[in-house]
C-alpha cells in the first residue's frame, strides 16, 4: 500500500517500503508465480506461497479475518467475504459497513491485532515485525502488496477468494473488472496529440511511473507520464523535483492529495514557477479522490473513468 490513505508522511513511507515486498503471490498448488488460483482451491486447508518463498497455510475457512489494508478490505467485501471480517484498520473507510477499528497497517500492534482472535490477517506489507510477530502466535498472515499492474490486482482478488472460501465469487469479480476495463478502454478515443500527465501523490512531489497500476491506467488512456523519464532511485514511486516538473510542462496535473494535503488548482498555481506550466495556465489541474486513486481494488474503474472524462474535456478545449 502506498501513500494514499494516511497523512502526508505515512503516504510517503509506504511506497518506498512496499518495493521490498514481492509484487505477487502464488497459490502453491498452481506452480508458476503468475498462475491464477481456481475456485477448487476453496477446499481447506489451502497453502499460499508468499514473499521469499514462505508458505501460509489456512487450515479452515476463516471467520475472524483482520484486514490491515484498505484495498484488501474492499476486495474482501467485493467477493462476499465481508461477514467473515472481524476488524479492519483505521484507514479502511470503504465500504462503510466494514468494522473499522484503531488498528494500524503502518504501525501494527501485534497484541491489539491478536486481541481480535483472528484466524487470518491480511496486510499490504510486512512492517514493524508484523509477520514475525503473528507467526510467533501461530496466526496466519497473508501479504497482498501494492499491485504493479491490473493483472496483479486481479491475481490478489483471486488469492483472497481462495483464502476465504470465495473462489467462485472472486473469479466473477475479476471477470467483471476485466470486462468493464476492456469495454471502457475500447470506447475511449485516444488523444489527438501526445498529452503529458503528472500524477501527484502528495505535496512533496512523489509521483508514479508506468511501472505501477496507476501508471498503467494513464498508459491505457494514451497519456505520456512525465515521471517515466525521471532518474530516481525509486522506479515506481519516484520523488520528483519542482524544477523537473516545471521543465516537463505537463498538459494535465492529477492531484491525488486533495484530502491528505489540501491541494487544488489554487495551491498548485501558487507554487514558484508553476504558473508557466501548460496544465496550470489552462486550468487542467484536477483533483481525484485520494482513496479511489490509490487503491488497486474493484473501484479502479472509477479512477479510470474520472481521468478519461478530464482528458476528453481537455481535447474539446484544444479543438
What is the predicted role of each segment?
Residues 45, 64-126, 223-226:
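A short, structured surface patch at a secondary-structure boundary
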Residues 49-53, 101-111, 231-242:
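Short helix-initiation/N-cap motifs at beta->coil->alpha
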Amino acid at each position: 500500500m502506498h501513500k494514499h490513505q494516511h497523512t502526508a508522511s505515512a503516504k510517503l513511507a509506504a511506497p518506498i517500503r512496499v518495493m521490498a515486498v514481492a509484487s505477487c503471490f502464488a497459490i502453491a498448488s498452481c506452480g508458476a508465480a503468475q498462475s491464477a488460483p481456481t475456485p477448487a482451491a476453496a477446499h481447506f486447508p489451502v497453502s499460499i506461497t508468499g514473499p521469499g518463498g514462505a508458505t501460509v497455510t489456512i487450515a479452515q475457512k476463516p471467520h475472524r479475518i483482520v484486514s490491515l489494508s484498505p484495498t484488501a478490505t474492499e476486495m474482501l467485501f467485493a467477493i462476499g467475504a465481508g461477514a467473515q471480517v472481524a476488524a479492519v484498520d483505521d484507514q479502511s473507510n470503504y465500504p462503510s459497513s466494514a468494522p473499522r477499528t484503531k488498528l494500524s497497517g503502518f504501525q501494527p500492534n501485534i497484541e491489539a491485532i491478536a486481541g481480535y482472535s483472528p484466524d487470518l490477517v491480511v496486510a499490504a506489507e510486512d512492517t514493524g515485525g508484523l509477520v514475525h510477530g503473528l507467526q510467533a502466535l501461530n496466526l496466519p498472515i497473508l501479504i497482498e502488496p501494492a499491485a504493479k499492474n491490473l493483472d496483479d490486482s486481479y491475481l490478489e482478488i483471486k488469492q483472497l477468494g481462495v483464502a476465504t472460501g470465495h473462489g467462485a465469487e472472486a473469479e466473477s469479480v475479476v471477470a467483471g473488472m476485466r470486462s468493464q476495463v476492456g469495454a471502457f478502454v475500447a470506447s475511449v478515443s485516444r488523444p489527438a496529440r501526445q498529452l503529458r500527465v503528472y500524477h501527484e501523490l502528495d505535496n512533496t512531489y512523489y509521483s508514479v511511473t508506468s511501472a505501477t497500476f496507476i501508471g498503467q491506467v494513464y498508459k491505457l488512456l494514451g497519456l505520456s507520464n512525465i515521471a517515466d523519464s525521471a532518474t530516481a532511485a525509486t522506479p515506481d514511486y519516484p520523488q520528483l523535483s519542482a524544477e523537473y516538473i516545471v521543465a516537463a510542462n505537463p498538459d494535465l496535473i492529477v492531484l491525488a492529495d486533495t484530502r491528505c494535503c489540501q491541494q487544488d488548482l489554487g495551491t498548485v498555481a501558487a507554487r514558484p514557477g508553476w504558473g508557466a506550466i501548460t496544465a496550470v495556465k489552462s486550468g487542467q489541474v484536477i483533483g481525484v479522490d485520494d482513496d479511489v486513486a490509490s487503491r488497486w481494488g474493484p473501484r479502479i474503474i472509477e479512477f479510470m473513468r474520472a481521468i478519461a472524462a478530464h482528458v476528453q474535456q481537455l481535447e474539446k478545449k484544444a479543438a
